[in-house]
Swiss-Prot record:
Composition skew (Polar residues), residue ranges: 29-45, 66-80, 94-104, 1139-1148, 1228-1237
Domain of life: Eukaryota
E.C. no: 2.7.11.1
Sites of Phosphothreonine modification: T351
Complexes and interactors: Interacts with the microtubules. Part of a low affinity complex that associates with, but is distinct from, the postsynaptic density. Interacts with SNTB2.
InterPro entries: AGC-kinase_C, Kinase-like_dom_sf, MAST, MAST_pre-PK_dom, MAST_pre-PK_dom_sf, PDZ, PDZ_6, PDZ_sf
The protein's name: Microtubule-associated serine/threonine-protein kinase 1
UniProt GO MF annotations: ATP binding; magnesium ion binding; microtubule binding; protein serine kinase activity; protein serine/threonine kinase activity
Species whose genome carries this gene: Rattus norvegicus (Rat)
Cysteine disulfide partners in this protein: none
Bias-annotated ranges (Basic and acidic residues): 738-779, 1083-1092, 1278-1294
Tissue spec: Both isoform 1 and isoform 2 appear to be restricted to the brain. Isoform 2 is strongly expressed in the neurons of the subventricular zone and granule cells of the olfactory bulb, Islands of Calleja, hippocampal dentate gyrus and cerebellum.
Span of domain AGC-kinase C-terminal: 650-721
Length: 1570
């Protein structure tokens, strides 16, 4: 940076300017005399007070300004403090200001400043940022200059908002007095300055010049003009002091430094000119005022302190007089010194050589074409908003994911909002804070303005609230505190957000908060400590007078509603509303119209929950203080420090927030999973208009300035290029390199080229990497915990995560929640039996604590497993390690189909860290292969993303290999009899349980064989053979599949380290192990799809506009929607791709209370992009919340819980369905033991408060459910007889409907098509769903019997038929005659063992049960007498196949009774043309266990998580009438057993179906022979 800019004020106390040094920061006396170093010095005789006032003055505001003013600057560390010789005795900065820190005036940030010690917290890793951070967060600055310890926490006792001396009006009066004297003595100087400032502000204000194309510079430009205006106002008000001029200059220098460090644009020259002009304008008055305020006595104090400090700091050992002379500005040639010191401080950034290189660098980056739309591939829509939409995109070169906000230009022009778009761009570009979303670049297209930001995967807090209701206090406290830090940062730079709400608080994949959406923000004046007098706080609260009412109605502050002036306190009001919403579940003020809502905001009191639901006292106090109608009294008006001091945060470590483990960690199914977001397509329809040609020729000229590229993006880019230069240097071995990517574009050379990169190395060449200096440097830099800002490209970050975690696959213990993937070493001399395959805890069925990442499961493997002999000589541990490392790196490189040049490996020094700035994911890898890695890689096994925003995606929660994108299959052409590879089956245990599934790995590939030529690699996990998933198949089945395929077999593999399987010590209890088997699926994928479609829960969740799946938070209510495992598969326990089969969620929001709008466009349908890879709903995501569940589900507002009106803006047309209440689930890894929960969890449905936001559906059904909560609880209790619900305490859908028959209010007026399930079977036609008024029931539980064929009336309790043709609205069916029995079956889910009748308590059900058995038995055994019941022909039982049109195999032995007898499934004849009403008997599925024999099993106690090994019963085929009658299982009811209706009574777990019903009075044999 040009030195000549630095010190307009440098010689203020000198009678004349030394020639040529006007703008030079001489080590001048300019500060020497004015700083009250006394208070800041380390001298033991001079106590350091806690206020910015000089200690020796007693901090009395009544002291004369001559004594007072000069001392205050002691608390500002000026940018020039870098000149190490301590310009201005820079001890001033010793205990003090955070100007070197990230905020412009972090004097606000007290000893627990948010930015101050963030240098401990790596948050967006590129090494290029280390220098920046060290300066920005105060590390090198403090170390290299003489005020070395000045930012140490111990010496930062005070914060600006507590400065007593600044607030008292007496101090202001003295300032005014001094100004009066000054104006009297120097009238012309003052007048000239004011006139020049006025002209300057008018000429250069942002509205009168074209906006700068660079966002950082544009922001700085705005701040410079604001500072000029502030100076003008203060001068007119007589409030100017020397101190003020110091701080003004300090801020200008800081801004200029930011401009140089953070922008590569040529527009820096314009900003530099502005700063020069402003410094020249204020230089004369500043000098004069300084002379006027000079205090000789104070000056001697300063000299004394400086001398002491210089001696103590060993900065000046010999020549103290020369030091003092230099400080007095008496040296005429300061230049060499300045250059030398700047070199020392900033690493030489100002030396000419450095300038050359930086110029060269910036010119090369300028030569690069600016980013444009063509650089990004759009993956999918994330969410819609009022002005545009946000898309998930991937950069084509770096393969890094971003969120791209596309704003329709036409909309902006019509609404005159162009300036606002620039403001948003500038703020996002300038902001560098771990709690604020960062922007990478912006550009315009023909129709849109696009902003490319970091992608934060975890969705927003609004979706979280919508799905789980109120947050536990600890969770709310953490989210709130992180938002406070974001707000503190923004306010220090003069940014008022104006639209704070949970929707704009995004959750990173590490569970931390990032603030986003600055579309309504205002840029005001950055904080100045000299502005902290009472009048200014008032002025600050009325900073903007535009009288706009903007924001979201529920969060708008009273002063905005009343159209008074407003300022930063509006954000604190919104924070109060947010905290209330976090803790209570709904906002405090409601109204059906904005007017009504605003009326409440201005006049109403807050309603607080009472009794059990009451909030903690300190939380209530904090909310009340934030929701003060008067902005001057509101907490936070004096700065964020006031809020941070509140007792609610008593035990909070503000500096370590990013290190805290979050309770909610999003779990992504793939790198492209956006299911945590609500697309809001129902509210905003402009997406489709994007393709229309709606551009206008006369678009404003400033729009062309929108394109910009932030330093983050340039750094990511340059690091990519740097890396690409490193990769080709890696040595290659032709013998060991085998092609990994058969589909690589181009000829074999290209594939070979890829192999020549990091990935292609074989063992011999890999060993050098482990000890390479790059690696060591890399680890060291990571351990330093300093981090860069820009997020690294995926390839780089991931690749090094691979390179540096060799120990991961041998370490059985990991403390953090990255239960990561392990790669088996191919060659290894380690003891072969100590390998352990782990599955992340979320997938584990076994006991789990609430911490996500404890070692959970071990896999026992036979000696030698995973350890094929090495062909490369000595198979030492390090080599195995390097093999792993490079294999992993190679996979990362190739699996993204990237060429070496594009995704090179990272060079040393970069921190592997997710850019979400979450320090949690820093890795400190050990190169020792046997060490344990304390923090495993933040990379998800399944994600190839480089996303800065947070641990790219979470560890796979899948039993199956969990690959983010399967590579295309490797096709092996057999030559002769051999394919040329060996495969082996391995056991993979689920968590700590004894249940394992079978996986298959490529054990050995013959050199030169067909497999090697095709690119197959030893050690890879086989996922599919000929397109058929092989997970769960036993070895012979896989071999059979391969052999069936003739001369050509297509094998899909994935590198082992890319799976979620971990290797650990051998299993001791392997003799207890049970295999969770999965049948080979005989049918094609379309069969699977139709099977899935036929599942009840899929039908329910397909009601698009009523129930959108919001996978995000199904964590609290898991059910067994058998999304992936077929009911017919005896290995239901382990679906191929379902991550936690036993934790699959309910039809997501069906049990989530406030039927949530979809948080993902792809979340609810099986063939959506997000769910096609794994058809399951997200597993638990709220770790450790079980103890807090009772708080989570308390009613929203006690007395007034029923009056929660909806947001005035809500206009969703679709009424809500009577969705079941959210039922608390359990954290993942819930133990197998029975867990007891408070009875109220079982009986009364918890209330989820609706978020009164425009996203919510109309209110009546939900509200009425809220009102009738107690009634519902009673009815549930009575109906269910208190039975615990199995599987996460959930009611089956039919049960749920049944429970609520009496509640008219619970049923919506509209029914979506998805609710009518397909009717399968011959002659069946799909019934059309109708919309009718009045109370309705799902056909699954009420009138419309989906199982009755066309034309058949469904019998009703009264014996009357519904004239409408079989769909009745109200009356539940009652089976009172043998001809009208109807058994319902939950097609998609193994849940209830008992026969489900729609009658209430047991009497009718028992009658039904008895009446049901005889006809069936007689029919089955052929012994039915013709003299049976007169007029009642045999009742055929039709067991519906799960997939229409697909032949279903009779499964393998299904289960046995306690005696081990195998029982086939009943095969029941079908009467094609039954003369009468055909009745459908539907066999209820039950949980199966894979254990085929053993002691008599007791009925399973209700668990929160179902048994992992419980397979399902396949529905049998319809067989001809002549077929041999089937034998029902021996575990059917014995004579006289009477099932209780409505209760979840279960047959023994090995039972197959509750088909053994007894006709009234008829005995029922336990088992029937053929």
């Amino acid at each position: 940076m040009s030195d000549s800019l630095w010190t307009a004020l440098s010689n203020f106390s000198m009678p004349s300017f030394p020639g040529g040094s006007m703008f030079r920061r001489t080590k001048s006396c300019r500060t020497s005399n004015r700083k009250s170093l006394i208070l800041t010095s380390t001298s033991p005789t001079l106590p350091r007070p806690h206020s910015p006032l000089p200690g020796h003055l007693g901090s009395s505001p009544l002291d004369s300004p001559r004594n007072f003013s000069p001392n205050t600057p002691a608390h500002f560390s000026f940018a020039s403090s870098r000149r190490a010789d301590g310009r201005r005795w820079s001890l001033a900065s010793l205990p003090s200001s955070g100007y070197g820190t990230n905020t412009p005036s972090s004097t606000v940030s007290s000893s627990c400043s948010s930015q101050e010690r963030l240098h401990q917290l790596p948050y967006q890793p590129t090494v290029d940022e280390l220098h920046f951070l060290s300066k920005h967060f105060g590390s090198t600055e403090s170390i290299t200059d003489e005020d070395g310890g000045r930012r140490s926490p111990a010496v930062r006792p005070r914060s600006r908002s507590l400065s007593p001396g600044r607030s008292p009006s007496s101090y202001d009066n003295e300032i005014v007095m001094m100004n009066h004297v000054y104006k009297e003595r120097f009238p012309k100087a003052t007048a000239q300055m004011e006139e020049k400032l006025r002209d300057f502000a008018r000429a250069y204000e942002p509205d009168s010049v074209l906006p700068l194309a660079d966002g950082v510079l544009s922001f700085i430009h705005h701040q410079i003009i604001e500072l000029a205006r502030d100076c003008l106002t203060k001068s007119r008000d007589g409030l100017i002091t020397t101190v003020y001029f110091y701080e003004l200059q300090e801020n200008l220098e800081k801004l200029l430094q930011d401009a140089y460090e953070r922008s590569e644009s040529l527009e820096v020259a314009f900003v530099t000119q502005l700063v020069k002009k402003l410094l020249i304008i204020i230089s004369r008055p500043a000098r004069l005022l300084e002379c006027l305020e000079f205090n000789p006595e104070e000056f001697y104090h300063l000299l004394e302190a400086a001398e002491g400090h210089a001696k103590e700091g060993h900065l000046v050992k010999t020549d103290i007089p020369r030091y003092i002379i230099r400080q007095l500005g008496l040296t005429r040639d300061p230049f060499p010194d300045v250059v030398r010191l700047e070199e020392q401080d900033s690493g030489g950034s100002n030396t000419p050589e450095q300038d050359d290189t930086s110029e060269g660098r910036s010119s090369t980056s300028k030569a690069k074409k600016p980013p444009g739309e063509s650089d990004f591939d759009t993956i999918k829509l994330i969410s819609n908003g009022a002005y545009g939409a946000v898309y998930l995109v991937r950069h084509r070169d770096t393969r890094q994911r971003f969120a791209m906000k596309k704003i329709n230009k036409q909309n902006l022009i019509l609404r005159n909002q162009i300036q606002q778009a620039f403001v948003e761009r500038d703020i996002l570009t300038f902001a560098e804070n771990p709690f604020v979303v960062g922007m990478f670049c912006s550009f315009e297209t023909r129709r849109h303005l696009c902003m490319v930001m970091e992608y934060v995967e975890g969705g927003d807090c609004a979706t979280l609230l919508k799905n789980i209701g109120a947050l536990p206090v600890e969770m709310a406290r953490m989210y709130f505190a992180e938002t406070v830090l974001a707000l503190e940062y923004l306010h220090n730079y003069g940014i008022v957000h104006r639209d704070l709400k949970p929707d704009n608080l995004l959750i990173t994949s590490m569970g931390h908060i990032k603030l986003t959406d600055f579309g309504l923000s205002k840029m005001g004046l950055m904080s100045l400590t000299t502005n902290l007098y009472e009048g200014h706080i008032e002025k600050d609260a009325r900073e903007f007078l535009d009288k706009q009412v903007c924001g979201t109605p529920e969060y708008i502050a009273p002063e905005v509603i009343l159209r008074q002036g407003y300022g930063k306190p509006v954000d604190w009001w919104a924070m109060g509303i947010i905290l209330y919403e976090f803790l209570v579940g709904c906002v405090p003020f409601f109204g059906d119209t904005p007017e009504e809502l605003f009326g409440q905001v201005i006049s109403d009191d807050i309603l607080w929950p009472e009794g059990d639901e009451a909030l903690p006292t300190d939380a209530q106090l904090l909310i009340s203080s934030l929701l003060q109608t008067n902005p001057l009294v509101r907490l936070g008006a004096g700065g964020a420090f006031e809020v941070k001091q509140h007792s609610f945060f008593r035990d909070l470590d503000w500096t370590g927030l990013l290190r805290q483990k979050a309770e909610f960690i999003p779990h992504l199914e793939s790198e492209d999973d956006t299911s945590y977001f609500d697309t809001r397509s129902d509210r905003y329809h402009h997406v489709n208009s994007y393709d229309e040609d709606d551009t206008t020729e006369e678009e404003p000229v400033e729009i062309r300035q929108f394109s910009s590229c932030s330093p983050r993006f340039s750094k990511v880019y340059s690091s990519m290029e740097q890396l690409s230069q490193h990769e080709p240097k890696t040595p290659v071995s032709a013998s060991g390199a085998s092609k990994r990517d058969p589909n690589a574009k181009g000829p074999e050379e290209k594939v070979a080229g890829k192999r020549e990169g990091l990935g292609g190395l074989t063992l011999r060449e890999k060993t050098w990497r482990g000890g390479s200096p790059e690696i060591k440097r890399f680890s060291a830099s990571e351990a330093s915990f300093l981090e860069g800002e820009a997020s690294p490209p995926l390839g780089a970050r991931r690749r090094f995560s691979a390179l540096l975690e060799p120990s991961r696959f041998t370490a059985p213990q990991e403390d953090e929640d990255e239960a990561r993937l392990r790669r088996p070493p191919r060659p290894s001399s380690d003891p072969p039996s100590s390998l352990d395959t782990r599955v992340p805890k979320e997938a584990a069925q076994g006991e789990g604590t609430s911490t996500p990442g404890e070692p959970e499961a071990t896999e026992r493997s036979h000696p030698g497993d995973f350890c094929p002999p090495s062909k490369d000589g000595d198979p030492s541990g390090p080599r195995a390690t390097n093999d792993l490392v490079l294999r992993r790196a190679r996979h990362q490189q190739l699996s993204g189909d990237l060429s070496v040049e594009k995704r090179p490996s990272r060079t040393g020094g970069k921190v592997i860290k997710s850019a979400s700035a979450t320090a949690l994911s820093v890795m400190i890898p050990a190169v020792d292969p046997h060490g344990g890695s304390p923090l495993a890689s933040p990379m998800s096994p399944r994600s190839l993303s480089s996303n800065p925003s947070s641990r790219d995606s979470s560890p796979s929660r899948d039993y199956s290999p969990a690959v983010s994108g399967l590579r295309s299959p490797i096709t092996i052409q057999r030559s002769g009899k051999k394919y040329g590879f060996t495969l082996r089956a391995i056991r993979v245990y689920m968590g700590d349980s004894d249940v394992y599934s079978v996986h298959h790995i490529v054990w050995h590939v013959e050199e030169g064989g067909p497999a090697q030529e095709a690119g197959l690699c030893a050690g890879d996990l086989i996922t599919h053979v000929n397109g058929e998933p092989v997970h769960g198949m036993v070895h012979p089945e896989v071999v059979e599949l391969i052999l069936k395929s003739g001369n050509k077999v297509a094998v899909t593999t994935t590198p082992f380290e890319n799976t979620s399987i971990r290797i650990g010590p051998a299993r001791r209890s392997s003799y207890k192990a049970k295999m969770a088997r999965r049948n080979k699926r005989p049918s094609a994928k379309d069969g699977q799809e139709s099977k899935k479609r036929s599942s009840l829960f899929r039908k329910i969740t397909k009601q698009s506009n009523l129930l959108h799946t919001s996978r995000s938070l199904s964590s609290l209510n898991r059910s067994l929607s058998s999304s992936d495992s077929l009911p017919g598969s005896p290995t239901h326990g382990l679906p191929a791709r379902s991550p936690t089969h036993s934790y699959r969620s309910t039809p997501d929001s069906a049990y989530l209370g406030a039927s949530s709008q979809s948080s993902s466009p792809a979340s609810s349908t099986p063939n959506s992009p997000a769910s096609s890879a794994s058809h399951h709903i997200r597993p638990s995501t709220l770790h450790g919340l079980s103890p807090k569940l009772h708080r989570q589900y308390r009613s929203a507002r006690c007395k007034s819980a029923g009056n929660i009106p909806l947001s005035p803006l809500a206009h969703t047309p679709s009424p809500t369905q009577a969705s079941p209440p959210p039922l608390p689930g359990h954290t993942v890894g819930s133990s197998h033991t029975t867990q007891s929960f408070p009875a109220k969890l079982h009986s009364s449905p918890p209330i989820v408060r609706p978020r009164p936001k425009s996203a919510e559906p109309p209110r009546s059904p939900l509200l009425k459910r809220v009102q009738s909560a107690e009634k519902l609880g009673a009815s549930l209790g009575a109906d269910k007889k208190g039975a615990l619900r199995k599987h996460s305490l959930e009611v089956g859908h039919p049960d749920f409907r049944k429970d609520f028959h009496g509640e008219l209010a619970l049923h919506s007026l509209a029914e979506s098509d998805g609710e009518t399930p397909p009717i399968e079977g011959p002659g069946a036609t799909r019934q059309v769903a109708m919309r009718r008024l009045g109370r309705q029931e799902s056909p699954l539980s009420l009138g419309a019997d989906p199982l009755l064929p066309d034309g058949v009336q469904r019998p009703m309790a009264s014996g009357k038929e519904d004239s409408a043709g079989g769909t009745e609205a109200c009356t539940p069916p009652r089976a009172t005659t043998p001809g009208s029995r109807t058994l319902e079956r939950d097609l998609g889910c193994t849940r209830h063992q008992s026969v489900q009748t729609e009658d209430g308590p047991g009497g009718v059900a028992r009658a039904l049960a008895k009446a049901a058995l005889s006809p069936v038995q007689e029919h089955e055994t052929g012994r039915r007498s013709s003299s049976g019941e007169a007029g009642t022909p045999p009742v055929p039982i039709v067991v519906e196949p799960a997939r229409p049109g697909v032949k279903t195999q009779t499964p393998q032995p299904l289960g046995t009774d306690s005696k081990g007898l195998k029982e086939p499934v009943a095969q029941i004849p079908l009467v094609p043309d039954a003369p009468r009403v055909r009745e459908r008997w539907v066999l209820e599925e039950v949980e199966e266990r894979t254990t085929l024999s053993g002691p008599r099993s007791k009925p399973a106690s209700p668990k929160l998580s179902p048994d992992p090994q419980t397979p399902t019963v396949a529905p049998t085929k319809n067989v001809p009438r002549s077929a041999a009658p089937p034998v029902p299982p021996a575990s059917l009811m014995v004579p006289g057993t009477k099932p209780e209706a409505g209760s979840n009574s279960r047959c023994p777990a090995e039972g197959v179906a509750s088909a053994g019903l007894t006709k009234t009075g008829a005995p029922s044999p336990a088992s029937l022979g053929p």
